[in-house]
Regions:
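Short, basic, low-complexity termini and linkers enriched in Ser/Thr/Gly/Pro
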Residues: 3-21
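Sec/Tat signal peptide C-region and signal peptidase I cleavage site
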Residues: 23-27
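Ser/Thr/Pro-rich low-complexity tracts
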Residues: 28-147, 212-248, 254-258, 350-358, ...
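Acidic, Ser/Thr/Pro-rich low-complexity intrinsically disordered segments
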Residues: 31-79, 88, 92, 102, ...
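Short, solvent-exposed loop/turn segments enriched in Ser/Thr/Gly
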Residues: 47-52, 91-96, 150, 398-404, ...
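Aromatic sugar-binding surface patches on proteins
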Residues: 77-83, 328-333, 438-444, 554-561
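Short, surface-exposed loop/turn segments at beta-strand-coil junctions that are enriched for proline
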Residues: 85-91, 198-204, 216, 338-342, ...
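Charged, low-complexity interaction regions
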Residues: 619-630
């Protein structure tokens, strides 16, 4: 007789319950959404089979991970540990690793694919005599579980190079690594600076590498992955201060800033009537730089004597208005110019932060045809303390969700921009979006059908996304770390939406600049959601002053009044979206609960089956017939009693687990984000009287 192997299942489920209780830290919105706080290992070889540990919240119903656009199935080994096999054709690079499960897709964490062998540091190598032996052209990976340093030994021949590199920000960890290379005598020979330790051996010897976290912080967030290379870092190009390099319209120079803020100089000739844009890209490429751009008019007399007259000294890029939900400053300057006569500019470029980080100097003939869009996960406004939230990029079933879109490097002459995205998850429709002329912020919305399957895909049409790396409760007490990466992923959550809002008309709504516009709204509600809604208009003005739509409790319709005159909207086209909170009860750990209920049902069925077999055997015992095998019947009867007892015990255990899950994770109010479809308006000139 089949007896369910229930004991292990109960233990597994109990672990799952404990791991899935917490809601995303510090978030105004508390609806279930997968959040990855760390992963390990931080990398592997193409084609490797590894056990991947995923830490975070709401990691229920695991399906797969996304490595950029590649979907890799997950096979559960134990709670939050999964077996995966990397595709053999993955190219060596840094990838965005995202979890996909019941509630959609998580934020990304960095995962490196490399052809180098990897050595794991468990932390047992906390003293020099316990140093872990490593070799050149390999990777060392570990995590600081205690404040002790990690020690490694490496054999080097005279003249061999050792370059050890690690950048915690690049790997999306909190680790700030200190590293030192020591001689066999213990004398320090080289130190890690800006994530690089470079050393050339003066003699054959066994050298020691010591690494520790800068402030001796510990925990799963403090991992590292150091590449040990035999190739010396490239020598910096020597540029004399008197060097002046030519540059032409349409060209891009890629180089490094000079040490201690020394300037680099370029001459740019132009003809009358030419239009061009001078752009410096460094800070927005992820470097901690503050480029300084000085432009002067260059003239030469017949003898070749130069005369310089100031043209412009360009500061940081202007702040985006209205401000996005995630801080997105740009310290990269740009300057647009239309030449009235033939001439030349003397361009001087340096870094106010005096780094030697990379930069790009672009001389564009015109604004790029394809906007360099950046997607942000919008959050609910109104937090009393300004912090950092990871946000969500998941559409609930039967609901609408939106991504906030930033178009950097735009100016007053930038053309309107229609927002589109392709390669959507199954069951999802793109509702589009809009950024007006000269504006830099907009919203693109997506709607999921009521039966859309949980899943995710990497969107096309939006090249970049920006994330808060770690949730921060108070940005005045802790730094909010951001990371800009590739295209955003959009997920579908199996959790139904409490409501979504639609305008009765989806075409462009026209209004005079001195008038009010009434917009009729339709509300589709979940059966369990009857509360009133207060929605803010995002994308027009600063969120603190944004107009609101109030929809009464239980109402299926409402109205949004836009006072264009009060908002001082200039004539032109605008796009915005309505967003607000909605509370609805949600029970987390539904997978654990469903599994426990399935075990309970299995145990109850086993009780019935064993009971029937017991009664059948008792009837044979009490009223035997010729030909009955009484000995076999007694054995079967004994097994039936044992099976029934085991099934009763399994039922008791399953019932206790269900009670435990419901007690620890009862249905609770969760705050969702409710959206409308994107709304377009056209503000017209006031009619002359």
């Amino acid at each position: 007789m089949h007896r369910p192997n229930f004991q292990f299942s109960v233990l597994s489920l109990q672990f799952s319950v404990l791991l899935a209780f917490a809601a995303p830290a510090f978030s105004q919105a508390t609806f279930p959404t997968p959040t990855l706080t760390s992963i390990s290992p931080l990398g592997a070889k193409p084609g490797a089979s590894i056990e991947l540990t995923l830490r975070g919240v709401d990691l229920e119903g695991p399906q797969s991970v996304l490595l950029n656009e590649r979907t890799i199935p997950l096979k559960s080994v134990k709670p939050n540990v999964f077996s995966i096999t990397l595709p053999a054709d993955l190219k060596p690079a840094l990838y965005d690793c995202r979890f996909i499960g019941r509630y959609g897709v998580s934020n990304p964490r960095v995962f490196e694919v490399t052809t180098l062998d990897s050595i794991d540091s468990t932390g047992a190598n906390a003293k020099p005599d316990k140093a872990l032996k490593v070799s050149l052209n390999s990777v060392v990976e570990g995590c600081f579980k205690s404040n002790s340093p990690h020690w490694f030994s490496v054999e080097l021949k005279k003249g061999q190079h050792l370059t050890a590199t690690f950048d915690g920000r690049r790997f999306d960890t909190r680790t700030e690594l200190l590293g030192a290379l020591l001689a066999p005598t213990g004398r320090e020979l080289a130190h890690m600076r800006a994530g690089v330790l470079a050393f050339t051996a003066a003699a054959d010897a066994t050298y020691f590498l010591r690494v520790n976290e800068l402030m001796y912080r510990t925990g799963d967030d403090y991992g590292y992955r150091i590449t040990l290379s035999s190739v010396a870092p490239p020598a910096q190009r020597t540029v004399m201060l008197e060097d002046v390099r030519p540059i032409l319209i349409g060209q891009t120079v890629r180089d490094y800033f000079l040490p201690v803020g020394l300037p680099q100089v370029f001459d740019l000739p132009f003809k009358a009537g030419e239009k061009f844009i001078i752009e410096v890209h460094s800070h927005q490429l992820g470097h901690a730089t503050d480029p300084h751009l000085v432009i002067e008019n260059l003239a030469k007399d017949p003898a070749g004597k130069e005369t310089l007259k100031p043209q412009a000294e360009v500061a940081d890029a202007p702040a985006i208005v209205p401000a996005p939900s995630i801080n997105l400053p740009s310290r990269d300057p740009s300057y647009a110019y239309e030449a009235k006569a033939d001439g030349a500019f003397r361009i001087t470029l340096s870094d106010n932060f005096a780094t030697t980080q990379p930069y790009e100097l672009r001389i564009l003939k015109e604004a790029p045809k394809l906007e360099d869009l950046i997607a942000l996960n919008p959050i609910l406004p109104g937090a009393k303390t300004k912090g950092g939230e990871i946000g969500s990029a998941n559409v609930p079933r039967g609901g609408i969700a939106a991504l906030e879109i930033i178009a950097p490097n735009r100016n007053a002459l930038s053309e309107p921009l229609e927002l589109k995205a392709d390669k959507l998850p199954a069951g999802v429709t793109c509702l589009g979006g809009f950024i007006g002329k000269g504006q830099s912020l907009g919203y693109i919305a997506f709607q999921a059908s009521a039966d859309a399957p949980a899943g995710a895909s990497l969107l096309s049409g939006i090249p970049h996304s920006r994330f808060v790396c770690y949730a921060v409760a108070d940005a005045t007490r802790d730094n909010v770390l951001y990371r800009t990466t590739g295209a955003p992923a959009l997920g579908v959550s199996a959790q139904p939406a409490p409501a979504f809002v639609q305008t009765e008309k989806t075409d462009i709504l026209e209004v005079a600049a001195d008038a009010k516009l009434d917009i009729a709204l339709k509300v589709t509600r979940h059966a369990d959601f009857t509360d009133a809604l207060k929605l803010k208009a995002l994308g027009l003005i600063d969120i603190a002053k944004a107009p609101e739509a109030d929809i009464p409790a239980k109402a299926a319709a409402g109205k949004f009044t836009l006072d264009v005159k009060a908002l001082k909207l200039a004539p032109g086209d605008y796009g915005f979206i309505l967003q607000g909170p909605a509370k609805m009860k949600v029970q987390r750990n539904v997978d654990a609960l469903a599994a426990a209920e399935a075990r309970l049902k299995e145990a109850e069925e086993a009780i019935v089956k064993a009971g029937n077999e017991r009664e059948f055997g008792k009837r044979i015992r009490e009223n035997p017939k010729p030909g009955d095998d009484l000995e076999a019947n007694e054995k079967a009867l004994k097994l039936a009693f044992e099976a029934e007892a085991q099934a009763e015990a399994d039922k008791k255990a399953a019932s206790a687990l269900i009670k435990n899950i419901n007690a620890k994770s009862p249905p609770k109010d969760a705050t969702f984000i409710v959206y409308s479809n994107p709304i377009r308006i056209r503000v017209k000139e006031v009619a002359k009287k």
